[in-house]
Amino acid sequence: MSTSVAAIVSPMVVVAEDSRDTRQMLKRAFELKGYRVLEAQNGKEAVDLTRTFKPNLILVDLNMPELDGLETIRYVRGMKGTQDPVPIVAMTAFHVYGMEQAALEAGCNEYLIKPFDLDDLDKKLKGLGFIV
């Protein structure tokens, strides 16, 4: 399959995570499954990438600089022209009481506590009807 055809048919994922190591791990995992991955180091970059590329899935860390994950989710949910609605998985290493509820109320579809196993992510994505 040519690169241009692969780019048309391969689902696109935005990984919004300020930890380079976590971004790279998620990028490799998705690329091995044939997904195109766009990386964002903060919420502002994630919003810009989402606006420009209209991804099929967004993974967003809740604790990021410039625009935190909750605000990123709210902003994406308010955008016109994104995949209707693009699935969003919120991730956090700083789980506190009420955080999951706040993320769901902001508009995420799933919630993961870091560190997590990639099988846990796969289960969440399958539950959303996303093929992994």
Please give the residue ranges for each predicted region.
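Non-catalytic signal-transmission and effector/linker regions of two-component phosphorelay proteins
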Residues: 1-14, 119-132
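Conserved acidic carboxylate
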Residues: 17
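Charged docking surfaces used in two-component/phosphorelay signaling
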Residues: 24-32
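Receiver (REC) domain active-site loop signature in two-component systems and cognate sites
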Residues: 64
